[in-house]
Every structure is written in structure tokens, then in C-alpha cells.
Amino acid sequence: MTAAWTPSLFGGGEPAPDPTVVPRRIVLDETSWVDLAPAWLTGADAWFDGIVAEAPWDQRRRRMYDPATGGSGTVMEPRLTCGWRVPEAPDPAPAVAEALTARYGVRFDRVSANYYRHGDDSVAWHGDRVRFTHEAPIVAIVSLGAPRRFGLRPVGGGPSTRLTVAGGDLLVMGGRCQHDWQHTVPKWPGAGPRVSVTFRHDDPGPRPSIS
């Protein structure tokens, strides 16, 4: 059974970044890190309601290889997606991108969203494709709606890191995280609906660093 989503006591009002919230940095290795800032966005409930109702959601097909048969086929991704260039994105995405740019020193110009409708929606272990074009991409995620688990694991094997992100939380992956680590949003029985709004940048970005 899917749990109903309950609005946060702190999620009302107009959506806006809270400049007083300072992210906590989690060092994954010598060149990879994650920043976590709970309640970074005020008014998260209003953004959740608006983006769920108005975004041009699409459920994409993904080609999958079957090692047992040697064949391939397509499956529906277990989530809905959409995306914009930042100038065309609905509010408050441009203001959020501006706040992230001021903090991380790169111009965030693309925004995408994943809608996890219930606990059976998920995304498998992966590194973002931006790793093919950027040495140290910064990927910033604003979470809206119900809490969900977020996992990270090193590509070469080793202990994983498990986090829980709630509505209004900011999670940022930086350094060589997309190259040397994978991340996932696993299935979570009973979880309510959640949207992740992800900001990326086309410019080269910084050199790998944990500072």
C-alpha cells in the first residue's frame, strides 16, 4: 500500500532558498563529496503541488539487454520525467539555479525532474551522463514531497552510503562523484510521492576538490 503524502509543517509559503542554511559536506573519498542541506528550500510543498500538476511529464522507454537470451527489448522507466533549460523553466527554478550558482561557482543552465509516484518507482544504480563531458560536474538535487532513501556506492566496490532526503532538502554531488561513484533511489514500500528537481551545468566547472 502506498502511503499518503503529508505536507511538512515548514513547507508552506512561496518557494525560495533559505540563505541561512549551510550544507553539511560528506567526504566520500579524496576527490568526491556530497553536500546535504535539510530544509534548504522554504515553501517546498507549494512547488511540489505545482510541478506535479503542471509539468509536462513523460514516461520514457529504456532499452534493456537480456544476458540469458542475448536479446534486448524495451521497458518503461519506473518514474515520470521532464526537463527544461533554466530560463524557460517554471518558477522557482530560475531563482534556485541562481542561488546554487552563487554558492558553487558554476552556471546551472539545465533542470530536469523525476516524479516518483509511489514506493515502487525508482532509479537504478548509475552515474550521470555528464561524466562523459565534465571532469568534476556538480549535480544539485532539490527534493520535494515525501522522504526517500538515496544511496551512493563506489564504482570499484566497497561500502555504500545511505541517506534519507525529505521535502525541501538539497543534496549536491561534486568532485569526481559521477565518475567514481554511482547513486540510486531504491524502491521503498509504502513511500509517498516525491519529485526530485535536478540542476546541471554545461560549462566545464571546477577541478576535482573536496574543499
Locations of regions flagged by a protein language model:
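Non-heme Fe(II) oxygenase metal-center motifs and adjacent flexible, charged/small-residue loops
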Residues: M1-S211
